[in-house]
Amino acid sequence: MISLDDPPSSHGNHEKYFVMKLAFSTNAFKNHALDEAISIISKLGYDGVEILCDIPHAYPGAMSEERIAVIKNLISIKGIAVSNLNAFTLYAIGDVYHPSWIEEDLELRSLRIQHTIECVKMAAKLGSKIVSTEPGGPIISSSLNREQLLKTFIDSLTEVVPIAEKERVKILIEPEPELLIQNSQEFLELMDMIESPCIKLNFDIGHFFCVGEDLCKTIYKLADYIEHFHIEDISKERIHKHLLPGEGVIDFKSVFRTIRDVGFDGYATVELYPYQECPEHVAMKSLEFLNGLVC
């Protein structure tokens, strides 16, 4: 949890008025059972945990009602919140991106749609109000043009919207380099084509940095849509490789000040899936760095 204070008053006092709630994603803990990952993340002092909705953690197809109840009870016992359900990858039946929202094969596309519907229902049962997902999918191998791909994406999302609205869960699009929606302008163009208030944004700090965006300006630009943040650092070359906060060149002090300025009061989840051999260590180091920021 990061606290940002006002500058000193004339009496030398600080008035604390903003707290950043920090979470850690279980997708770094793929070599651990979900129960163990939640326990470790809680023990380290994080405010929340992001749950991976894929193997080996919480793929809906492998989650019985009893299993969901066990996880919900564990979260309650550990005194930790669910920051987000991460429904981006689909290794259970495909890979990191496939099946995607924009598959030309309707049967494959339907698998992504149904997966997201089940994640939305599971989110409601676990007490989470948000589910993050991929921004359409890869466009390199498609024979469709951009306009057709956007229509396919929107048509696919539209099938999930009624369930999301009924369950009062928001679906967060996560722009990523080299996928259909990469940057802020493409995201805004998408939102202009979608009417439902349940479609919002998962602002991945590293992703926007990789595509050349000014992070602070982009946060202001997209503030009305942001429901959750992903945190990782990125090298000066802006290569899409997640690094521990503090090991790259992202100016986290400025980023957190901007998050404060726009009035965001949700969770920021540290996402370090490349570090599956030492997840507890990187989770601890990340929390130490972020809590040590003097903003």
Model-inferred region functions:
Residues P56-Y59, I93-H98, I139-L144, C210-V211, ...:
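A short acidic, helix-capping loop that chelates divalent metal ions and anchors anionic groups
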Residues L52-K72, P135-S141:
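Glycine-rich, proline-tolerant flexible connector loops at the mouths of alpha/beta enzymes
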Residues L52, L85, P175-E176, G206, ...:
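Short strand-turn motif at the edge of the Rossmann-like AdoMet-binding core
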Residues D35-E36, I77, A92-K200:
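Active-site acidic/histidine proton-transfer and metal-coordination neighborhood
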Residues D47-L52, S83-A87, S132-E134, A223-S235:
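Non-cysteine beta-strand/loop elements that form the S-adenosyl-L-methionine
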Residues D6, G12-E15:
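Short hydrophobic alpha-helical segments enriched in small aliphatic residues
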Residues H14-A23, A28-G45, A69, S76, ...:
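Histidine-acidic metal/acid-base catalytic patches
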